[in-house]
């Protein structure tokens, strides 16, 4: 049975190692709640999106002692940002006879960001007993419970029963506009964003007009730079994100945001940085085009694999179809630009001239939206994800340059491969998260791509300044 406490208040229960319980009105209230729960059972909402074990009523099998309510429901709904209790009934014989230490219950939430366990206390009742678990919900999602009933009379304590089939579904509030003041609404509802979308589409089409078909044909004959870029972007960097998520024990939503960010194709003005740092610009444009097209297959695959390895799929639905749709929004106009340049070269030149004045508008609009995003996304940001976000571009640059050096590519191509792996399209990852998840989850997960974008831009600008200073002092081309 799951109860929600009154808004702004929580029912305080002693933990298993604490005192013996409350007295007075609180004790009477607790006993009343317990009796009601035992008589009426629990109200649960099976979910069609879960596995059969969670989504359908399952009878209490013989030999099981623990249950919530009548044992027929495995999933229970609870509102976000609330406090309450769960009543777990135990039919283990001897719990209520008072002849010795009673069995102990340990309850663990497998996603503490969604549901936190505050404490557990026991109540003896007849031949059995019950446990009252105090909980606090956080972000919307599904938090599986790991429940263990142990006998403390033996050394070490004997495991009587273990349950992993119960879960708490924390339901989000209605997605009403979130305000941080009288005039500040969520950036996703800003009309400037919708005004910029057509310009982004045309800008990507004009980028496709810059792709040289001869360079693409040359990459097919000598594919080493292209293969190294794909290897770094879609194999090494996602694996690095997986390692960082494990090392820093990132919450599930943040881990998903980091995986998608590190699985994103090249972008973010990488060809511009190649120009400023003495790289091969035509190669950079071609590699960005190839990685964007390849991402339509590799990014959803990478996200699905690492979501499984990190057990993200247990609490968050990884929206592969929406991820693919966002990628196609970028890949299709770029591919259209390549076709336009091949079939209508004069029109492609016109398109390139027309888009130039609007590039400044896109830049200003992007800076404005970045500020508005930061107000929401970086609220409550923590040190671990800041450190990880700072290292991602640096690791990408080192991985790309190291791979290119191993194959002894020319210096210009080494720099290009390094930049293509290190400067990923973090804003594309942010867009995928915002379009795929609920608002609170999306803003939380978007901390990863937002910080990577900030770090990458700052680090690349520092490299450009350092390169100019070094080139002017040492006369290096």
From Swiss-Prot:
One Gene Ontology biological process: response to retinoic acid
TM spans (from-to): 225-245, 253-273, 281-301, 320-340, 361-381, 383-403, 417-437, 450-470
Stretches for region Disordered: 1-21
GO CC terms in record: membrane
Topology relative to the membrane: Multi-pass membrane protein
Gene3D superfamilies: 1.20.1530.20
Keywords recorded for this protein, A-Z: Membrane, Symport, Transmembrane, Transmembrane helix, Transport
The keyword Transmembrane belongs to this UniProt entry's keyword annotation: yes
Superkingdom to which the source organism belongs: Eukaryota
Subcellular location: Membrane
InterPro entries, sorted: BilAc:Na_symport/Acr3, Bilac:Na_transpt, Na+/solute_symporter_sf
A molecular function GO annotation: bile acid:sodium symporter activity
Similarity field: Belongs to the bile acid:sodium symporter (BASS) (TC 2.A.28) family.
Role noted for this protein: The ubiquitous expression and the conservation of the sequence in distant animal species suggest that the gene codes for a protein with housekeeping functions.
Protein name: P3 protein
Species per Swiss-Prot/TrEMBL record: Bos taurus (Bovine)
